[in-house]
Amino acid sequence: MRICSDQPCIVLLTEKDVWIRVNGKEPISLKANHMALLNCENNIIDVSSLNNTLVAHISHDIIKDYLRFLNKDLSQIPVWQRSATPILTLPCLTPDVFRVAAQHSMMPAETESEKERTRALLFTVLSRFLDSKKFVSLMMYMLRNCVSDSVYQIIESDIHKDWNLSMVASCLCLSPSLLKKKLKSENTSYSQIITTCRMRYAVNELMMDGKNISQVSQSCGYNSTSYFISVFKDFYGMTPLHYVSQHRERTVA
């Protein structure tokens, strides 16, 4: 039986002993009540037996949110080897939770609460694989088709770091010139991405009690508070203080 998904990643749960074959290679045996995490994009996946209701479909956005949630320095994560079979397997400890997560992953989220519930359930499924040393590498590999996403993930994994183009390119095993070229083809640039990352972080910091503009500026990697205010105003159309006051007015209203 061939597995198809319009998402880059799936996690399946077995009800009985099965085998899984990826791209025609030697089949991998999987016992009952085991999970397999697979990269679906550009891969042919066959399984000897499968209950379609026990497949969780995981989108690029969920992967990006999950890597951000882990708060790891992604620059230290080894690159996934292209020659490796893109699959991780392990026993399932909470099959009932998995069933609910799989069900939600196939349902359109009609409300914000349903969207957040699905997100939380899929995070729970993914977290089972955290003990695997290759897990985060495989997650990053699944974002490879969009280089800008990978750059966002690397910078946001340690926003305080003094990043530059060469450092990020090295994390992706690319030359700085090739990274610039790839980002340009995606209608963005390194400077746009790092500014967006810093501004997102700045807003979160500003909403925390006790954080002043100078502290937020430094935590976002800016040595000059006045320059930080200028960049913030260009990005959001208002100064940091104006942004905070508007947010508080909306909250009170």
Curated annotation (Swiss-Prot):
Feature: DNA-binding region: 166-187, 213-236
Disruption phenotype: No change in arginine-dependent acid resistance.
Induction: By acidic conditions. Forms an operon with upstream adiA but not downstream adiC.
MF GO annotations: DNA-binding transcription factor activity; sequence-specific DNA binding
Record keywords, A-Z: DNA-binding, Transcription, Transcription regulation
Keyword Transcription regulation: yes
Keyword Coiled coil included in the entry's annotation: no
InterPro entries: Homeodomain-like_sf, HTH_AraC, HTH_AraC-typ_CS, Tscrpt_reg_AraC-type_HTH
GO terms for biological process, alphabetical: positive regulation of DNA-templated transcription
HTH araC/xylS-type domain sequence ranges: 149-246
Top-level lineage group: Bacteria
UniProt protein name: HTH-type transcriptional regulator AdiY
